[in-house]
Amino acid sequence: MKLVDITKENWKKVIFLTTNKKVTIQGNREPYDAGSMPTLCEDFVASNAFSIVQSVYDNRWITKAIEHEDQLIGFAMYGYNEEEGFYELCRIMIDREYQGKGYGTQAIKLVLEEMRTIDECKEVYLSTDPENIVGKHVYEKIGFAAENKMLDDEELYKYVY
């Protein structure tokens, strides 16, 4: 597994990655897989499309695609949160087709390795929805500790190198 740059060759694949469950929608037209469309709303993370646009206009954020065996399987966004005054793993997602296989844990460890190369970065924060039980378990397993604080209605976690 590795982190790769988002490029003009792969950006469309990145925005089509989703954590949303596969849903077939019927209407006046033929049924289609809603998961085959880029999503703007995810359960516990902002969409990849939103995140990529955010990183264009706020260049403190670094965006990477997560690749495993030549397949794009996820997305990460990290950098310095100027408003809060700390380094943050702002977004991490693994596509629904690849969840439950340990890829999220591996991907977070890769991001932490990347962030460790930043001289000033001695700790990394992330925040998550209080109902994201699976995510919280993964974060704690890696070594993030709950701060018992909220950030924008999300629980704050900290990882210290």
For the regions a language model picked out, list residue spans one by one:
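Conserved beta-strand-loop-alpha-helix junction that forms the acyl-donor binding cleft
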Residues: 126-136, 152-155
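Conserved GNAT acetyl-CoA-binding A-motif
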Residues: 115-127
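Conserved acetyl-CoA-binding loop of GNAT-fold acetyltransferases
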Residues: 140-149
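Conserved acetyl-CoA-binding loop-helix of GNAT-fold acetyltransferases
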Residues: 94, 100-113, 137-141
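Conserved SAM-binding loop
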Residues: 3, 100, 128
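Terminal substrate-recognition subdomain of acyl/acetyltransferases
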Residues: 156-161
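Acetyl-CoA-dependent GNAT
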Residues: 1-90, 95-97, 114, 148-152
